């Protein structure tokens, strides 16, 4: 179940990275970035955030390639010792649990607000948790195959909607480029943390790859695809709704879909399609974080995998129910992104340096 003998291909690893990153960001990123930049240059912030994510992912991949048959939970003890390694692993587990809880709660908010109005959050959350549990019980390979089905559906629907929204796109809403200078763009970069700090999954994936030497390739391609998705989203949303229109909307991505219709087609409103694919993407992010957390508990505390999965269910449920309203949900997301920035910004570099120093000393 958690054994690295169940291998995934480089293409599957790439698709896992893409699906892991593509979650709530498409729905909320235009607003969070534009609130910081207060200009139409948010797409540049996204581009810079993507570049930083590629660099961070490459460092994590290089570190994991030093121990290609072990996950981070196993090889961290070789780098910093057993107890400190376990402590860092517990921090990682907590992060994955918090991120998974955030994705589940966002999914609940979207379903309640747009699809099943009045449905209790606990009912939606419990349903998602049990389906997620079922999805990860057989290990990473079935998860990879599920993601292979989700990804092409996402691409087709997303690009179709993007093309159809060209009818309300106004290029002047994106001008002037860098009219307020570079500083607003740099302020916007930090708000991309939650959308891009997902290359940490390589701490887990490399041990399951058939060709660990291709880990960097998977990170570069995967993050590049996600960056393209987010840039297209930023450009289309700001171009259609304007800067002022974006910052006043909670879910500007969905509001864009509501802003146009094509008479004569069987389906004249398209936000339902976007909801479908992004509920799938939120679910995809949740199950891989659930899997990563369960894997960590199993390997750190030497427990049976299935017991860890069942044991973490109430933890995720409690965390996902803690936000009392929509604002609290976004605060949780900001908190998770800040934690990720501190953990995965500097720690991989430090561990890579220590690892190389130790191996050089052994020689």
Swiss-Prot record:
Q: Which residues form the signal peptide?
A: none
Which subcellular locations apply to this protein?
A: Cell membrane
Disulphide-bridged cysteine pairs: none
Locate the coiled-coil region(s) and give their ranges.
Answer: none
**Membrane topology designation:** Multi-pass membrane protein
Keywords from UniProt, A to Z, are: Amino-acid transport, Cell membrane, Germination, Membrane, Transmembrane, Transmembrane helix, Transport
Give one Pfam hit by family name: Spore_permease
| Gene3D superfamilies the UniProt entry points to | Amino acid/polyamine transporter I
Q: Can you supply one Gene Ontology CC term for this chain's record? A: plasma membrane
Principal cellular location given in the protein's record = membrane
Residues that span the membrane, as ranges = 8-28, 41-61, 84-104, 113-133, 149-169, 189-209, 218-238, 273-293, 305-325, 335-355
Please cite one Gene Ontology biological process associated with this protein.
Answer: amino acid transport
Kindly give the InterPro entries that the UniProt entry links to this protein: Spore_GerAB
Family the entry assigns: Belongs to the amino acid-polyamine-organocation (APC) superfamily. Spore germination protein (SGP) (TC 2.A.3.9) family.
Role of this protein: Involved in the germinative response to L-alanine. Could be an amino acid transporter.
Designated name of the protein? Spore germination protein YndE
Q: Which organism is it from?
A: Bacillus subtilis (strain 168)
